[in-house]
């Protein structure tokens, strides 16, 4: 079974569940209570929109327990003496790895929390999570050509630029060294 919580120095990464996604989509005032964290004012961030939430919920519903951990992950900044636990971003995988061991990741950080290295830390955590599954051999990611901050996050995490994909996005790849649980 895939671990559904992953810790980094400043973040707790929590795998999305059907209950969390349902609350996020349909009962937003209960979502932070279930999550146990304060929401930023601009939630949801970036490309993590209602369509992404619905996609993750549909995939978790269709895939049952085997789908857990292969879709959305919430990035919660750990409490400090001056601030409570706060949801700062979302990321995750677009599904389990394919037959060759390739999985795709994506991520978004709330505007109020950008520029603090949290996206880099979130991606590091997703890479570590992929390694922990023992199933992923290669990760891919895409950014828009006019998003240098996102490109820097990937480069800082050992991804290499592979050129443009057919949709005009910059494609990145990274080899993963799987580690059995």
How does the language model describe each region?
Residues 141-151:
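Conserved beta-strand-loop-alpha-helix junction that forms the acyl-donor binding cleft
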Residues 117-120:
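Glycine-rich acyl-CoA binding loop
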Residues 157:
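Conserved dinucleotide-binding and phosphotransfer motif residues
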Residues 1-104, 109-112, 125-133, 144-146, ...:
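GNAT-family acyltransferases
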Residues 154:
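Conserved active-site tyrosine of GNAT-family acetyltransferases
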């Amino acid at each position: 079974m895939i671990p559904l919580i992953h810790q980094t120095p400043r973040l707790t990464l929590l795998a999305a569940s059907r209950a969390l996604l349902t609350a996020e989509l349909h009962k937003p005032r209960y979502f932070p209570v279930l999550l146990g964290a304060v929401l930023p004012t601009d939630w949801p961030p970036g490309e993590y929109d209602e369509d992404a939430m619905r996609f993750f919920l549909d995939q978790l519903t269709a895939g049952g327990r085997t789908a857990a951990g292969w879709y959305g992950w919430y990035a919660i900044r750990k409490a400090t003496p001056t601030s409570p636990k706060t949801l700062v971003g979302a990321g995750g995988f677009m599904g389990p790895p394919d037959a060759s061991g390739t999985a795709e990741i994506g991520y978004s950080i709330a505007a109020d929390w950008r520029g603090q290295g949290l996206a880099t830390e979130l991606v590091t955590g997703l890479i570590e999570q992929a390694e922990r599954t023992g199933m992923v051999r290669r990760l891919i990611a895409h950014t828009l050509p006019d998003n240098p901050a996102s490109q820097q996050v990937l480069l800082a995490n050992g991804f290499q630029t592979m050129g443009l994909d057919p949709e005009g996005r910059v494609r990145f790849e990274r080899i993963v060294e799987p580690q059995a649980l």
